[in-house]
Amino acid sequence: MTKRIALYPGTFDPMTLGHLDIMKRASKLCDKLIVGVAINRAKNPLFGLDDRVEMVEHVVEPFKDRIEVEVLPFEGLLIHFVEKCGASMIVRGLRAVSDFEYEFQMAGMNDRLNPDIETVFLMSDPQYQTIASRLVKEIARLGGDVSQFVTPEVDLRLKLSLIHISEPTRPY
């Protein structure tokens, strides 16, 4: 029997509970889950690649007793990485209509590049629909509590990475 390999790609800067929810649910759809941590030169990540890989490896550790999980960095065209990994499906999480529009277009292009690879969309659990890495970073930068959006380890990493940022100067 052919092993069902799924690939869940993302920047994971930082890793959120929404990402974790999609990983947990995706792990039930396959025999092996590969989490691809993207190097995206167009983005200016808060965390380096090694830190992002470590964050993901930490949260997927509990899955490893029931499914094979691998965390790999990648750069370049996603479909090439999927092919290299031998995956037959790309997993994407959807929070809102705006996500769908973008992901629908990407899925269509990936299908044109390789029609043998399916894109599987998982709707975000309602409690995670408003969580976005971009917003988590912004809240953390402004001194807000992000513990309800990320794991304790990621919360600590955010605090440590932002410790050098001083309080904003008051205009009075």
Where are these regions (language model features)?
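Charged helix-capping and loop-helix junction motifs
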Residues: 50-52, 102-108
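Short, flexible loop segments at boundaries between secondary-structure elements
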Residues: 115-130
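Short, glycine-rich nucleotide/cofactor-binding loops
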Residues: 6-18
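Residue-level signal for inorganic ion chemistry
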Residues: 16, 56, 143
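Short, surface-exposed acidic-centric catalytic microdomains
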Residues: 20-78
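Short, glycine-/small-residue-rich phosphate/pyrophosphate-handling segment
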Residues: 131-150
